[in-house]
Design a protein with these regions (language model features):
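Active-site cores of enzymes that catalyze phosphoryl transfer or operate on phosphate-rich substrates
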Residues: 260-287
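Intrinsic, low-complexity N-terminal interaction/targeting segments
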Residues: 15-31, 97-98, 267-270
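Mobile "lid/hinge" segments at catalytic clefts and subdomain interfaces of large enzymes
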Residues: 150-236, 408-454
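Flexible, glycine/charged-enriched surface loops at secondary-structure junctions
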Residues: 65-69, 143-147, 218-267, 310-318, ...
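Small-residue-enriched alpha-helical segments and adjacent helix-cap loops
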Residues: 2-15, 35-180, 208, 286-412
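Residues that form generic nucleotide/phosphate-binding pockets
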Residues: 132, 136, 216, 245, ...
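Short acidic (Asp/Glu) and glycine-rich catalytic loops that position anionic groups and cofactors
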Residues: 33-35, 188-193, 222-225, 278-282, ...
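Short amphipathic beta-strand and strand-loop transition segments with alternating hydrophobic
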Residues: 27-28, 171-173, 273-275
Length: 454
């Protein structure tokens, strides 16, 4: 399908009376302190090596020379000046990174596990469902009223199953791949076997089911225009009516949740090398420090993955890393070493694999602290030590995470943080408060066990 040009998109995309202007996309670049933000939504997180080279060139010419890997498996370019927006858009469209329809860009938020289709433990290949869903979303005009933040999650019992994202609509496979549990404005609770699901459906009708759900939601949106996400609807009395409407609208059976505890999801095999579902094939997982790449690192990454015997796409993970699939056994060591040389963490206990942060000050309007600088301090401090996953957020919005990390440091001022530990019993979205107004040095000492209270 021919991708629209920048000028065509300017004519076709209609303004809407909501806050979508604040949500980055390919054609909409809201302004931060450092310039416009362009979000490139990748189909199921996949990116070809030739596209990697093109993105590296684009950020060098039209942005700040950096590429952010997002926790939805997308890319983000920052520092885009107004006079460069059209040039950047047309460059990205020429790389095949645009949507099927202009308005469809906002609905490309479909996440699958980064090893979907290649995972040795998968119960079902969710890339087939995800690809069909992406096409339906981008070509069904009635759904264009939904929020650009409206997100979908499809898990297939992979070792890299996405367990830490709240989605508007989620599907999670049972052990044999025949059924999907489903839920809204939540995440699959694997600790209870997905007992929090609203019900289950036959996997063969997954896209039909989501279409039925969205049709019912759009009807409610017509009555209540502020309802453009499932989290809005769940707060209203109409939510129970919505659940009944789905049963009336969906032509196939909706059954009770299927309680299951997939063993594979406990592994979270995102960093290192692992066997694939395909015989004698392996995938490699790695993460750049703080989930960011320079243009030069992106070029070198493209060169490394292009040396494989195949040209299959790299996958961007929900932990701001990459998966290099379809490696032969004799390629593994070279690829791991080459990635490590250009700044990737290639071992799961590497500090750079476990420190996460947003853009922060001075780049973001809301940022109270330079979390990238402080995040790098933690990486350097724990260079030869083990650190649990920690999220440094420059404000309480916590854009990087929808659920608490093991530890969360919330900025209170430049270089100072309140430190939280994940705790399901806590009412705080970050967990249990451990200490207040710690300097980043004190945060490091606390995590290292050198201090217990300030």
């Amino acid at each position: 399908m021919k991708h629209p040009t920048c000028d065509e998109n300017k004519q076709e995309i209609q303004p809407v009376k909501d806050r979508r202007f604040a949500c980055p996309g390919l054609f909409r670049m809201p302004k931060a302190n450092d310039g416009g933000i362009c979000r490139i939504k990748l189909p199921l997180g996949k990116l070809q090596s030739t596209q990697m080279l093109g993105v590296a060139d684009a950020t060098t010419q039209f942005a700040d020379g950096q590429i952010e890997l997002t926790t939805r498996g997308n890319l983000q370019l920052r520092g885009v000046q107004k006079h460069n927006e059209a040039k950047l858009i047309d460059t990205l469209l020429s790389l095949g990174l645009g949507p099927l329809t202009p308005e469809g860009d906002d609905l490309r938020n479909v996440m699958v596990a980064p090893t979907a289709g290649i995972d040795k433990s998968m119960a079902i290949d969710t890339t087939l469902v995800g690809t069909k869903l992406l096409e339906m979303l981008q070509t069904t005009k009635e759904f264009f009223v939904l929020s650009p933040k409206f997100g979908f999650l499809i898990n297939g019992a992979e070792t890299t199953t996405v367990v830490d994202h709240i989605a508007d609509i989620w599907l999670s496979s049972n052990d044999d791949g025949q059924k999907f549990n489903f839920g809204f404005a939540s995440r699959p609770d694997y600790s209870t076997g997905c007992a929090n699901a609203e019900g289950s459906i036959d996997a063969a009708y997954a896209v039909d089911f989501i279409k039925s759900c969205l049709e019912c939601l759009v009807k409610i949106h017509e009555q209540f225009p502020t309802v453009s996400r499932m989290k809005h609807l769940r707060k209203l009395p109409q939510y129970s009516e919505f659940l009944q409407a789905i049963r009336n609208n969906f032509p196939f059976n909706i059954d009770k949740p299927v309680i299951c505890f997939p063993e594979a999801i406990k592994k979270q095999s995102l960093i290192g090398s692992f066997s694939q579902y395909q015989n004698n094939m392996f995938y490699i997982g790695a993460r750049p420090a703080l989930g960011r790449l320079t243009a030069e690192q992106m070029r070198k990454t493209a060169a490394i993955v292009a040396k494989r015997h195949t040209d299959s796409a790299v996958r961007i993970t929900h932990h701001q890393g990459i998966i290099v699939p379809d490696c032969e056994e004799n390629e593994i060591e070279t690829i791991l070493n080459d990635l490590m040389k250009i700044g990737y963490a290639v071992h799961e206990h590497d500090a750079a694999a476990n420190v996460f942060c947003c853009a922060g000050a001075p780049y973001c309007h809301s940022g109270l602290s330079n979390v990238q600088k402080d995040g790098q301090y933690l990486i350097d401090y724990f260079n030869k030590k083990t650190i649990s996953p920690i999220h440094l957020t420059a404000c309480a919005k916590a854009c990087v995470a929808t659920v608490p990390f093991a530890y969360t440091a919330v900025a209170t001022d430049e270089g100072y943080y309140n430190l939280f530990q994940s705790d399901n019993a806590s009412d705080s979205k970050f967990g249990k408060l451990l200490n207040e107004n710690l300097s980043i040095i004190e945060v490091a000492n606390y995590l290292d066990g050198k201090i217990s209270r300030i």
